[in-house]
């Protein structure tokens, strides 16, 4: 049976002419390429091709005068001063000298960057020359330059009030009660001041529950939606506890190792992450929440020059963010000791196992000098926790609390999911039409399955005149960081990515995720669409579907239905047909997302929980949803219907949201 959208090829330009998408802002014409135009790595050695142009008029190339790699602190300080930090004074800036910067400011851990500014090793040295009696809970003098750099960017979102409708479930013995505001739990002057500087007004659901659990020194396994504020959920209570307790034996061990020529660092807290990008993002968040403290965060990851990372470590390290492979390397070189590690965090734990890091993780946690479970405080965070991961938690966690916050990866309120039938041969044309309709300030993330496909699609878009970039596993660390910075800054508002970017990347203002190639499993789909709609922002996820994606049909339908998304009838028909054919093989009829959660606590044999926090989702259903596709079955109303007919699965504007920024 051939499932062909019969009108897909008819008059795309004419169909879009009537969509009133503010065509003046969406013209594809432009002038010839300027000297400053970003050129993809695989095209840099080619002779310039005639006809390349920048879309200055449509916003594809940034018109900002500011250099893309300039400091975050370039904007004026219009926040107003924190009421928690009342001792600001201009004379304090002398404590922070200028840091040497790498080319990619905001990425962290490279060049001569020391994280918070270097200090001379004299009487004012901050990191390890202080005595044990120093009060780590008191804030150090401020630095206006550093404050502006750390806190000048970012958007905390506009949709936090809708988080109250997300269901939450906590299981385990004696679960601490959740909080409603950051002030409900004592975290100290430094943390509260930095929360205000970060402009966090209220905790997200995962923060409401995880912060008091961690503050009570309970081990935690948290299954939370992507973009839910997981990083702050563990950094805030860990850092506040370090400020309250001080360095303890770790500082003494570093002093014994040599005051000036120390070679080994003993971090108090260790955060493991699967990818370089996620590790750097966690590190950048740690820099914010350790501002004006004596805690110095560091980051180590593979794919970068190890000598510079060693030199950065030797300046002091209290909180270490690391990828497993590079951390094992540092431990074997004698640069890192885990003897006094009080806090262990495994972020994106399922992804680390998927990537084959289990031997390294067990080497770090079980076969070295790290304190055993019950002595250390351990937390596991992930977007999915299948039973295999939960069983692994038995080895790492002690009397833990299992926390499930919302159904993983998509919320009906924040991410609108659209699925359209597109034959392989038509995908590029469909993509161009989507990009032409996109607002000039919108960031678009396009996912493909292969590295070759990423390069090929970036090459195609580049020749079509779009300012785009790409990221995948074969790119050098420098090229990956440059691509991410070009995307974040808006100079290249289109990022073509493979799965390497699907996990953990926190780019807060991504408006649109496009699955140019759908993944083969639903978990990967969940993580991809989670790149938009992050931390309260509204997002749109569009997926190109055809016969190659039959295997994901049933799970995709289950997810769309549970998220209260509009479902095209052809997808329902395909799911029924595929499910019926596969039923003889024992395929389960229940949704893997049943109950609104991405995972369940395997310890609950009967479904009863020790404690539960829950609230119902918003009851209002999506508009539309009837008569999908009409008599054409899988064809729908052609690509014009992609925007305004039920053949696509609903009208983009049915939510009253202007997705295109016009």
Curated annotation (Swiss-Prot):
Region annotated Disordered sits at 19-144, 601-633
Give me any GO biological process, just one: positive regulation of translation
Q: Which GO terms describe its molecular function?
A: ATP binding; ATP hydrolysis activity; DNA binding; DNA helicase activity; eukaryotic initiation factor 4E binding; gamma-tubulin binding; mRNA 5'-UTR binding; mRNA binding
**Sequence ranges of Basic and acidic residues compositional bias:** 44-68, 94-130
**Segment Interaction with NXF1: which positions?**
536-661
EC identifiers of the protein = 3.6.4.13
**Phosphotyrosine, modified sites:** 104
On this chain, the residues bearing Phosphoserine are 82, 90, 131, 183, 456, 594, 605, 612
User: Where can the Glycyl lysine isopeptide (Lys-Gly) (interchain with G-Cter in SUMO2) cross-link be found?
Assistant: 215
Query: Which residues does the record list as N6-acetyllysine (modified residue)?
Result: 55, 118
The segment(s) forming the Helicase C-terminal domain are 414-575
Specify where it is mainly localized: membrane
Where is the chain membrane-spanning?
none
In this chain, composition skew of type Low complexity spans: 604-622
Where Omega-N-methylarginine occurs, the residues are: 101, 110, 592, 617, 632
**Which residues does the annotated region (Interaction with GSK3B) include?**
100-662
Q: Looking at the UniProt record for this protein, which Gene Ontology cellular component terms does it annotate, in alphabetical order?
A: cell leading edge; centrosome; cytoplasm; cytoplasmic stress granule; glutamatergic synapse; lamellipodium; NLRP3 inflammasome complex; nucleus
| Extra remark beyond the main annotation | Encoded by an chromosome X-linked gene which escapes X chromosome inactivation (XCI) in females, but exhibits developmental- and tissue-specific differences in escape from XCI. DDX3Y, its homolog on chromosome Y, is located in the Y non-recombinant portion. In 8 to 16 cell stage embryos, expression from paternal and maternal copies of DDX3X is detected. Paternally derived DDX3X is preferentially inactivated in extraembryonic tissues of embryos from 6.5 dpc.
What is the role of this chain?
Multifunctional ATP-dependent RNA helicase. The ATPase activity can be stimulated by various ribo-and deoxynucleic acids indicative for a relaxed substrate specificity. In vitro can unwind partially double-stranded DNA with a preference for 5'-single-stranded DNA overhangs. Binds RNA G-quadruplex (rG4s) structures, including those located in the 5'-UTR of NRAS mRNA. Involved in many cellular processes, which do not necessarily require its ATPase/helicase catalytic activities. Involved in transcription regulation.
Its protein name is ATP-dependent RNA helicase DDX3X
Native organism: Mus musculus
